[in-house]
């Protein structure tokens, strides 16, 4: 309940009469905690970190870069998470954006530019290290999805969360099946369960509609799978040329 007081002048008595009016504001429903936790843990800014970490631990990278996991992951964490988060925080601090949800599309240009620049620097770092082309395709996937997200969002809202987790799953599936010939059913089952939990969480928080959730996951997974798949055959072509 909120009380507002207003004052009016009564001419015949030449005094101020105070009138009080009561305005009822219904209490706002609190958002459920568990969906908020899931949305935070599976935030798009963490997906590149999860993707690279899973690929590192599930492939021969563990042997090729033995005892270098922290060193390998440090630039990934720095460029894909710390720089974008710091940039968004600075934009919020300077009131360039009103909130972190970025509901206003007119505020998207600078935040998306921050993410694009960060992912581009990450790609350049590993490109300079001359790693496998298929791995560079994995690193380049967030840039591709970011461009697709920006284009689609001009006409229709799509779930960035589901695009991100779909991109992670697509990359890991493509690496395991097309490059390393690995069959990891337990890992894949866990990833799809997490994607389902994230989709339900976004619906419970009223952040997305079912169509936005489904399309976001489909676009992210298909594009990332095919992109890494193309990177695999491109690396094979380059290898054959050098024979």
Task: Indicate residue ranges for each PLM-predicted region.
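Short, Lys/Arg-rich, polar N-terminal cytosolic tail immediately upstream
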Residues: 1-35
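Membrane-interface helix termini and inter-helical loops of multi-pass transporters
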Residues: 59-68, 96-100, 128-130, 232-243
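Membrane-embedded catalytic cores of phosphoryl/pyrophosphoryl-handling enzymes
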Residues: 129-243
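Core segments of transmembrane alpha-helices
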Residues: 113-123, 164-169
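Juxtamembrane helix-capping/reentrant segments at transmembrane boundaries
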Residues: 32, 98-114
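Transmembrane alpha-helix boundary signature
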Residues: 88-96, 122-135
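The first (N-terminal) embedded transmembrane alpha-helix
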Residues: 38-59
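Loop-to-helix transition at the N-terminal end of transmembrane alpha-helices
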Residues: 65-81, 102-106
